[in-house]
Curated annotation (Swiss-Prot):
Gene: ACADVL
Known catalytic reactions: a very-long-chain 2,3-saturated fatty acyl-CoA + oxidized [electron-transfer flavoprotein] + H(+) = a very-long-chain (2E)-enoyl-CoA + reduced [electron-transfer flavoprotein]; dodecanoyl-CoA + oxidized [electron-transfer flavoprotein] + H(+) = (2E)-dodecenoyl-CoA + reduced [electron-transfer flavoprotein]; tetradecanoyl-CoA + oxidized [electron-transfer flavoprotein] + H(+) = (2E)-tetradecenoyl-CoA + reduced [electron-transfer flavoprotein]; oxidized [electron-transfer flavoprotein] + hexadecanoyl-CoA + H(+) = (2E)-hexadecenoyl-CoA + reduced [electron-transfer flavoprotein]
SUPFAM superfamilies assigned to the protein according to its UniProt record, in alphabetical order: Acyl-CoA dehydrogenase C-terminal domain-like, Acyl-CoA dehydrogenase NM domain-like
Organism encoding this protein: Macaca fascicularis (Crab-eating macaque)
Posttranslational modification: S-nitrosylation at Cys-237 in liver improves catalytic efficiency.
Active site, per annotation: E462 (proton acceptor)
Protein keywords: Acetylation, FAD, Fatty acid metabolism, Flavoprotein, Lipid metabolism, Membrane, Mitochondrion, Mitochondrion inner membrane, Oxidoreductase, Phosphoprotein, S-nitrosylation, Transit peptide
This protein's name: Very long-chain specific acyl-CoA dehydrogenase, mitochondrial
Matches recorded under PROSITE patterns: ACYL_COA_DH_1, ACYL_COA_DH_2
């Protein structure tokens, strides 16, 4: 199991957490993004909008040379901008051939997990049965995204998400075995491997003949990548590296033959000649010799997956097995993790779908007080909230996968949000299922307690949710901070930057005055969702106002304001969730899906509550004295606990 790692300066490294992105930095003086398509706007309205956008774009184009701007909604929302390119309309990326191929896979994969795989038995044995592994190999499940010419199934991200959702619905431990293998284990070879590396390793990995593992965590390094101690020293001849060290809690660690390993290597600065230690990624074969593993770890959940310590003792790794460039290992690791997070959201959407089915089945058959319990308001609210969480998670997963399939390189914040939201939503949904089932839910036979145990790890590995919240907030604030810096420079030459100042500065002044910035989703969301669209825009403006105020106040020091950053991240998560469900429900309404009105209710209900949370959360952040008192109390209480070694207060009885 892997947690995302952060280097010594927490704030600085968090801003690199989206590593590997080729997204151009957002700069001031860029042209206004192309006019948003408003499928529900009348012709005259769209013409007026286009004309308005055109005038502003001309003004900005005259101000400074045009440069590409991020199309990420999440990046833009921190700046108070409504960038809809990647979120409206809800993306449909599969062509007819891809859709038909996927349909041919869904049925046999579903049937396999219903008829062959036994999750309860896997859990008891604490291993995946050999018949299951063999069946998965025959289905091609070990190489879903490996190109067909290299022996894989060749799926795009959206197709992969659909199959992962099936796995997550039935057995998370099997999902970890498959995910540790292909989502992170050999993903580096797919993303950064040379032609020779791909041809050498991917065919056997895709067939399942060999398994892969991702080796980053060490005993002394959890969320701090720079503290890894595993080293790789180049030989005098330059033909190989000698690898020494150990990696902890590695999924597939006791089964894998191929490892993506991260180690410190000496790197010489060509300009100064100074030698620094930097992280480098390697493809390591067990067959190189010197690679061993410890016994399987005893765990709370995902017991059927193999988790073990992996040790490297004088392993000679050929220089051609460097993955990416020497010294670029942090970038490689972060890119791998960023690239796979949508898959976790898809899997957990499947988990929730299965759990909700169990909850509904119980609620429709259990009779208490002479009534089936689904008729009681408390149960109805639980079921409604459970399915809202599933709908949001699923909407996020397929939004991000589609963005990736469309060629976006700027999805890091969205992917992190989907992982945070999905892992927390799945826990809540499963916990509520147990509550609905009462004592029966606590029993082993229904299998819900196993799912709850399996789920707990998802908030920890591939980036703990705490670290990812800091990343979401800091990455968003970084882009906004650059914009504020650019506005400051523009003010020094107001005549040369008139278009810019009239555009962005005007919006900011109106927002600060509570007048709104003129943003609207009118004509973009379906007319039946117009009120929810208005709530989303209001929430965005409230959120952006606070982001700007806190950046102006703290400047670079914001990296140390973790109490604040956590709350900004929560607002960002709610805001992104509002937009993805608005988009998905709009598509269902416009295409006349039979579930459209149900989706409208899910969307409206989510938006009402999310808007209220954002409004209350941002209002609290704006009342500085009270917030500062809270933060001081948190620090003081925590300090007292640490000094005491536990609870400070005595028992009320005094002994």
């Amino acid at each position: 199991m892997q947690a995302a790692r952060i280097a010594p300066s927490l704030g600085r490294q968090l801003l690199r957490f989206g590593g590997g992105s080729s997204r151009p930095t957002a700069l001031l003086g860029q042209p206004w993004p192309g006019p948003a398509r408003r499928p529900y706007a009348g012709g005259a309205a769209q013409l007026a909008l286009d004309k308005s956008d055109s005038h502003l774009s001309d003004a900005l184009n005259k101000a400074k040379p045009a440069k590409a701007e991020s199309k990420s909604f999440a990046v833009a929302m921190f700046k108070g901008q409504l960038t809809t390119d990647q979120v409206f309309p809800y993306p449909s990326v599969l062509n007819q051939e891809q859709t038909e191929f996927l349909k041919e896979l869904v049925e046999p994969v579903s049937r396999f997990f219903e008829e062959v795989n036994d999750p309860a038995k896997n859990d008891t044995l604490e291993m995946v049965e050999e018949t299951t592994l063999q069946g998965l190999k025959e289905l091609g499940a070990f190489g879903l995204q490996v190109p067909s010419e290299l022996g894989g199934v060749g799926l795009c991200n959206t197709q992969y998400a659909r199959l992962v959702e099936i796995v997550g619905m039935h057995d998370l431990a099997v999902g970890i075995t498959l995910g540790a293998h292909q989502s992170i284990g050999f993903k580096g070879i797919l993303l950064f491997g040379t032609k020779a590396q791909k041809e050498k390793y991917l065919p056997k990995l895709a067939s399942g003949e060999t398994l892969a593992a991702f080796c980053l965590t060490e005993p002394s390094s959890g969320s701090d990548a720079a503290s890894i101690r595993t080293s790789a020293v180049p030989s005098p001849c330059g033909k190989y590296y000698t690898l020494n060290g150990s990696k902890l809690w590695i999924s597939n660690g006791g089964l894998a033959d191929i490892f993506t390993v991260f180690a410190k290597t000496p790197v010489t600065d060509p300009a100064t000649g100074a030698v620094k230690e930097k992280i480098t990624a390697f493809v390591v074969e067990r067959g190189f010799g010197g690679v061993t593993h410890g016994p399987p770890e005893k765990k709370m959940g995902i017991k059927a997956s193999n988790t073990a310590e992996v040790l490297f003792d004088g392993v000679r790794v050929p220089s051609e097995n460097v993955l990416g460039e020497v010294g670029s290992g942090f970038k490689v690791a972060m890119h791998i993790l960023n690239n796979g997070r949508f898959g976790m959201a898809a899997a957990l959407a499947g988990t929730m779908r299965g759990i909700i089915t169990k909850a509904v089945d119980y609620a429709t058959n259990r009779i208490q007080f002479g009534e089936k319990i689904h008729n009681f308001g408390l149960i109805q609210e639980k079921l409604a909230r459970m399915v809202m969480l599933q709908y949001v998670t699923e909407s996020m997963a397929y939004m991000v996968s589609a963005n990736m399939d469309q060629g976006s390189t700027d999805f890091q914040i969205e992917a992190a949000i989907s992982k945070i939201f999905g892992s927390e939503a799945a826990w809540k949904v499963t916990d509520e299922c147990i509550q609905i089932m009462g004592g029966m839910g606590f029993m082993k036979e229904p299998g819900v307690e196993r799912v709850l145990r399996d789920l707990r790890i998802f908030r920890i590995f591939e980036g703990t949710n705490d670290i990812l919240r800091l990343f979401v907030a800091l990455q968003g604030c970084m882009d906004k901070g650059k914009e504020l810096s650019g506005l400051g420079s523009a003010l020094k030459n107001p005549f040369g930057n008139a278009g810019l100042l009239l555009g962005e500065a005007g919006k900011q002044l109106r927002r600060r005055a509570g007048l709104g910035s003129g943003l609207s989703l009118s004509g973009i969301v379906h007319p039946e969702l117009s009120r929810s669209g208005e709530l989303a825009v209001q929430a965005l403006e409230q959120f952006a106002t606070v982001v700007e105020a806190k950046l102006i106040k703290h400047k670079k020091g914001i990296v140390n304001e973790q109490f604040l950053l956590q709350r900004l991240a929560d607002g960002a998560i709610d805001l992104y969730a509002m937009v993805v469900v608005l988009s998905r429900a709009s598509r269902s309404l416009s295409e006349g899906h039979h579930t459209a009105q149900h989706e409208k209710m899910l969307c409206d209900t989510w938006c009402i509550e999310a808007a209220a949370r954002i409004r209350e959360g941002m209002a609290a952040l704006q009342s500085d004295p009270r917030q500062h008192e809270l933060y001081r109390n948190f620090k003081s209480i925590s300090k007292a606990l640490v000094e005491r070694g536990g609870v400070v207060t005595n028992n009320p009885l005094g002994f």
